[in-house]
Amino acid sequence: MSDATTTRVCPLAERATATQVIEDLAPSPWVVRRCLETGFVFLENPPGYDSLKEELAWQVTYQRESQQRARAEPLRYALSRCLKYLRRSVARRHKVADLTLALAARAAAGRPHDQAVHLVDVGCGSGELLGGLMQRMPAALRQRCKPHGVELSTELARQSVLALAPHGGHCRHATALDGMARFAPASLDVIVLSSFLEHETAPLPLLRHCDAALRPGGFVLVKVPNHASWNRWLRGARWCGYRWPDHVNYFTSTTLRAMAEKAGLEVERMNGRDRFPLSDSLYAVLRKPLRPVAANGA
C-alpha cells in the first residue's frame, strides 16, 4: 500500500484543538482522535486520494473487510447478511432509495413542469442507487429527473456511466470535492451522500460545495454510521462501523447537525427513527434555506 497519508485537525472545528487519542481501536499505523472541544471522532492520518482510486477503492476494501468479518465471526456475519436480504428483497425496504424518491417528488412538485429535476449521488459506486431509482419512478417523474454521479474509483465510475447513460445521466470520475465543484451554482435539487461522508477527509468543505450547488430549498440526504449506537458501545473495536483506513469520520446526531449548520444547511429531518440507538446507521435530510443565511464559521 502507498505510504502517502495526510494529517488532519478536527474536521468539524477546522483548526487545531485539544484532542485525545483513542487507544486500541485502529491497527497501526492509523491514529484515531476525539476532539475535546466538539466531541468529533476522526482518523488523524488517512490515506491520500490517489490510493483511493485503485488499491483502497471501495469495492476492494469492502470485499476485504467482508472476508475478514466472515472469518472472525461466521455466524454473526451470516445472520447480518440474511437480515439485509430480508429487508431489501422480502420487505422491500431500502430507506435511502425511498427517501431519495420522496425528495425528488417534492423537488419536482415545487418547480415548473417543463424544468428538469437534477439528482446527484456522491460516491455513487456502480450507479446502482440512481439507476434503480429511475426505473422505479412514475413515468411523469422519470421524464423530468436527470441522474448524475460522482465517483473516485476508476472501475466503479466506468460502471456508473453505463448505468446512468440510459436515463440521460452521467458519472464524473473525480474526487467528491472536485466533482461537486463542477456543478453550476444553484443547479441541483437533490444530493445523496449515502455511506459516503464517513469516507471524506474534508466533510465540511464538501457540505459547503453541496450548499453552493443546490437550488434554494434543495435537499441533501445523508446516511453515515451511527457512532452513538448501542451496538458500537457493546462491540467496541469490532463494531461494523469501524473500517480502516477508509472510514475517517465518525458522526453522532449532534456532530452531524453541527457540521450541517456550519455549512449553511438546515436539518429538516433527523427524527427518532433516523437516529435510533439500536441502529448502526444515522440518517438526516438537510435542506438549503429558501433565503440565504450566513454560514456559521464559513
Q: For each predicted feature, which ranges?
A:
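A SAM-dependent methyltransferase catalytic signature shared across enzymes that methylate proteins
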Residues: 11-18, 253-270
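Hydrophobic residues in well-ordered beta-strands that form the structural core
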Residues: 44, 222-224
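Short N-terminal helix/helix-N-cap motif within the alpha/beta-hydrolase-1
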Residues: 201-205, 232
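A short His-aromatic
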Residues: 195-199
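Conserved N-terminal segment of class I S-adenosyl-L-methionine
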Residues: 1-194, 204-207, 271-273, 280-285, ...
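A short glycine-rich, Lys/Arg-flanked "PGG" loop and its adjoining helix->strand segment in the class I
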Residues: 204-219
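Short conserved AdoMet
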Residues: 142, 201, 215
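Short, glycine-/aromatic-enriched active-site segment of Class I SAM-dependent methyltransferases
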Residues: 225-249, 254-259
